[in-house]
Amino acid sequence: MPNIFVEELVHTPIEKQVIEIVERKGIGHPDSLADGMAEAMSRELSREYIRRFGAVLHHNTDETQIVAGRSNPQFGGGEVIEPIYVLLVGRATKFFNGEYIPTDKIALKAARDYIRQHMQNLDPELDVVFNVRLGEGSTDLQDVFRRKSGNVALANDTSFGIGFAPLSETERLVFNVERRIYEEFRKKNPAIGEDVKVMGLREKDRISLTIAAAFVDRYVANIKEYDAIKEELENFVKEISSEYTEREVEVFVNTADDYETGCVYLTVTGTSAENGDDGSVGRGNRCNGLITPGRPMSMEASSGKNPINHVGKIYNLLANQIAARIAEEVEGVEEVYVRILSQIGKPINEPKALSVQVIPKSGYDISKLERPARDIAEEMIANVGKITDMVIEGKVRTF
């Protein structure tokens, strides 16, 4: 493929830089909730289209918005006073081959089910008000969606996706700390809600983790118990951190707490969306699950975009997969960055440019790495349709 470019990148690898900042917004963060509901809607619409017509029809649900509610958390149990407002907005094909599709009903059920499955203390019937506003897509983009080059979809936009590999030590640490708080710590400590944000800062060989963890009021009797659980969480994070790094790790939890005034991070539902924190698709984690200001990132929201021809989703997922394979399979790669640029109306397996930038390890020459890196990129762009199947089956994350 003539549009694949492999070159050496002259740049200080992230592990050798003095400062590194990494963030992850957990499952219950308002931005992550918006991402999750948007992706759930797209996935269920795709499955229903396939069930009815044997193919995914045009849709995008990547503009979902959350407007925070109002609550009165209290030790021992408070209440939600005004429910969270969720606007499920996007485009969907509502009529096809003489048949109407209940897209609003499908989207609403998908969003409610997502909340029910991921938020233990947030009632999607009582604590959330949903408003479904799915319109039809523009005529020109629907036409691009329907047209194909053979069996290959045509790009719906001129856009780009970015990926990199391998993850740094700090990136792996931040990602896994949030994951394990959600999957492990909360099982023994239901007082910790799903809204957990982890901010990592590495200064040379010292890492500090600042964690914002929403406590659920009904499981905490008083401020003394709150403090004990917070200390237990700090110790848990310190303990598991040694599995990901030998560097010194400091852990800070809920640093805005003021015990004298009784102002602590207490919620009724486990998410800050209940009281003042809005959420939007694409404002949180990139599709690798992280926010990494020290790395190139796409501003595209991957969640909710259709998995057939929306390059804002497909190319970001693919770029990360290409980078991961190159880093794993090509000997001598210290870091690799992949950028894929589409051109609207052109086959998605024929990008305008696919750039692979490699930082070789000491003693390795780019000339020895170029061919295997190119071969991996060429193979994966030729099989870009596999991304679609993985998305519909829920086998890849988008945030």
Swiss-Prot record:
Pathway: Amino-acid biosynthesis; S-adenosyl-L-methionine biosynthesis; S-adenosyl-L-methionine from L-methionine: step 1/1. One of its GO terms (biological process) is one-carbon metabolic process. ATP binds at G135, E136, G137, S138, T139, D140. Keywords: ATP-binding, Magnesium, Nucleotide-binding, One-carbon metabolism, Transferase. It comes from the Archaea. Its EC number is 2.5.1.6. Pfam families: AdoMet_Synthase. Its cofactor is Mg(2+). One of its GO terms (molecular function) is ATP binding. It catalyses: L-methionine + ATP + H2O = S-adenosyl-L-methionine + phosphate + diphosphate. Catalyzes the formation of S-adenosylmethionine from methionine and ATP. Belongs to the AdoMet synthase 2 family. This is S-adenosylmethionine synthase. It comes from Archaeoglobus fulgidus (strain ATCC 49558 / DSM 4304 / JCM 9628 / NBRC 100126 / VC-16). The lineage of its organism: Archaea, Methanobacteriati, Methanobacteriota, Archaeoglobi, Archaeoglobales.
